[in-house]
Amino acid sequence: MRRSGVQCPTRHEPPESRRFPTMFNPSRDDVRRFFTETWRKQRAGEILTPLEAIAADWIVEHPEYHDELADADGAAARNYTPEEGRTNPFLHLSMHLAISEQLSIDQPPGIRAAHDKLAAKLDSTHDAQHAIMECLGETIWEAQRTNTPPDTDAYLQRILRRASRD
């Protein structure tokens, strides 16, 4: 018997603790709204949340995206296809945020040191992030291709190989 307000998992429902909250699985519109609103707030000099501040720093580093991010309605409707030959700014900025978070908590362990080595080699933290982004993309692609979780050891090794190349 179920009590009011208490969810008991069944064979067909995973327990609530195994479901991801919406904040970990935002929709395309949520992501676009986050970046366009962050850019609007940055330009207006409004107070930013810590995550918005990190996003705003990356947006500032990418002036090629400023006009698109300033057009919230257009950004919400725009599609980015490989045939256009344009980078999806929302995907690109989301990857910057993901890598920034990985570096802040050193997860996977060793990524911060690998990043620092790569940044020193490239003489640019921004270029290091772009190189790591390629490694992350390859790792995600491999996981999707093999229908397995991302291999964090292989991800870290890709970054270290990048840092060691002549």
Locate predicted features:
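Aromatic-anchored, charged helix-turn/loop surface patch used as a conserved interaction hotspot
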Residues: L51-A119
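Glycine-rich, aromatic-bearing surface loops/beta-hairpins
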Residues: W141, R145-D166
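N-terminal leader/targeting peptides and immediately adjacent processing regions
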Residues: R19-H66
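Amphipathic alpha-helical protein-interaction segments
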Residues: A119, A131, L136-G137, W141-Q144
